Amino acid sequence: MADNPTNLRNADFRKLLTSARSDRPAVSAFAKPADPKTGDDKPASFKHKHLKPAKFKKPQAAAHGKAKKEKTEADEDEAALKNILKNYRDRAAERRKQGDEKEDPSKLTAAYRAVPGDARSAQDQADLRKQAILESKYLGGDLEHTHLVKGLDYSLLNKVRSEIDKSDDDDDDDIDTAFDEKVTSSSSSSKPSEASLLAQELAQSHSENRMVRSLHRVLFKNEVPLHNQLFAKGRMAYVVELEDEETDIPTTLLRSLHDLPRAESAQSIQANNLIILKLSHVLSHLRAEPKKKKKEEFRVQLGSRDAPGAAAAAPGAKGDSIYDDLDDYVPSRKSRDSRDAGRRGSRRDRSRDRSRDRDRDRDRDNRDRYFEKSANSRREEEQNRREQQRERERAEQERRREREKEREQEKAKEREKKRKELEESSGYDECYPGGLVEMGGAWDSDEEADYSKMDAGPKKNQAVNRWDFDTEEEYASYMEGREALPKAAYQYGVKNGEGGRKNKKQSAVSDAKRLDRELNEINKIMDKRKAGGDGAGGGGDYKKPKY
């Protein structure tokens, strides 16, 4: 396949593009062979259509026009191809030239930032950028046009250093010349005039060189004071206002020289030191004198005590005795006094302890008596309060019984009134058979129900309970003598209505009764507390605390 002539290369393609188009097209390998007789590649069936009469043919003119037309078409194709290739770069040609012309670094930087490549290309671009930065450090320049940080531009730094050294050399030369001129002028005239000195000083002060002017100012103009008066002791101080805000700046205060305290001289300081030494010596002597006096008094006492013993031993000094060196025994009063004082102190302590114990016992008795009295008083108050509560309960029970009796009497009167109204004869009762008998039997007084003994049931609030009696025996006797009869016959067998309305009414009634019962209990408790406060003499609506 490598020997196949149809496989073209890039070089062949470039030759085809750059070479001019020939008059006849190139013969393709896939084209049909031409007819050997006629020399035409068209088939015989189409020849008669393309043949023209010989009288209409102009061989020279036709050939010239055909060549011109093909030439214009080739030029147009070349122009179009060049226009297309103008937008492309021949990188292979540039590589063959080995990159003689370097590209713009700004474009390379922009391309490096805009188009991300692979890791190797990115590393190459970073190395190129570092190399460009290192090269730019040595490009030089001046202070006005440098684009780097001061000190990194090495060539600019060397340039500035050389300029500074050159200026220093010029200053040294100017100083030397000025010194030589001064020496020569002094040697020429031993006593120069004031005008010449003034002119020379003015020339030095107005010199164009900055170094000369600064040296002249330092050497001849500045007179540094030996002692600054402002820094004298107590002359300058800071004034700080503590009452103001913290951010206030302290002000300085300059005192006058007359307001300053005078400094002490060396003689006054020495005199003061001498006075201090004298005073310390005198005080130390006074501090030591009481000890000396005590020692002298002790010696005097010992001498007076030893005098009688020495006089008694004088007559017997002739005889030899083993007790000659011993003194007579003199009892010491000091030990006896201390012993008596100790006894008196111990006796005083014992009496004080006894009195303290007696006071403690008395306080305990008083405290016990106080607590007993308070307990008895509280017990009596509790009994009185209970008695008052029982009296109030009895009175309430009596009032309740009286109200029940009155209510029963009213009911009896109403029943009697109704019976009398029914017993009144209208005059036609005898006409009805059995009318009087039925009427009389229905309203027989013996058959009337006694509702006072009717069993009210568990839901009825009982009028009498345990707390209405003082003792348990009275309540038990009341319960034994109580009669509980069944309810009236008309209360049995009553059919309830359809639906749950009756139940709702009954529940509402039971809730109302329960609330009334609780309210009555609360009122009773409040009445008891109020009565207890009134009986105790407090007069307040509060519960009495228990001890």
Swiss-Prot record:
Sequence repeats lie at residues 336-337, 339-340, 348-349, 350-351, 352-353, 354-355, 356-357, 358-359, 360-361, 362-363, 364-365, 367-368. Residues 66-94, 371-427 form a coiled coil. Disruption phenotype: RNAi-mediated knockdown gives rise to no visible phenotype in wild-type, but suppresses the effects of unc-52 mutations. Ubiquitous. GO terms for cellular component: nucleolus; nucleus; spliceosomal complex. It holds the Pfam family RED_C. Residues 166-178 have a biased composition (Acidic residues). Residues 45-58 have a biased composition (Basic residues). Residues 34-44, 87-106, 330-423 have a biased composition (Basic and acidic residues). It is found in: Nucleus. InterPro entries: Red-like, RED_C, RED_N. Residues 18-125, 164-202, 288-459, 496-515, 524-547 are annotated as: Disordered. GO terms for biological process: embryo development ending in birth or egg hatching; locomotion; mechanosensory behavior; mRNA splicing, via spliceosome; muscle organ morphogenesis; nematode larval development; neuron development; regulation of alternative mRNA splicing, via spliceosome. Residues 163-223 are annotated as: Required and sufficient for interaction with smu-1. Residues 336-368 are annotated as: 12 X 2 AA repeats of R-[DS]. Keywords: Coiled coil, mRNA processing, mRNA splicing, Nucleus, Repeat, Spliceosome. Residues 185-196, 307-317 have a biased composition (Low complexity). PANTHER family: RED PROTEIN IK FACTOR CYTOKINE IK. Belongs to the RED family. Intrinsically disordered protein. Auxiliary spliceosomal protein that regulates selection of alternative splice sites in a small set of target pre-mRNA species. Selectively regulates alternative splicing of unc-52 exon 17. Thus, smu-2 mutants selectively suppress the effects of unc-52 nonsense mutations in exon 17 by promoting the accumulation of unc-52 isoforms that lack exon 17. In contrast, smu-2 mutants do not suppress the effects of an unc-52 mutation that affects the 5' splice site of exon 16. Required for normal accumulation of smu-1. This is Smu-2 suppressor of mec-8 and unc-52 protein. It comes from Caenorhabditis elegans.
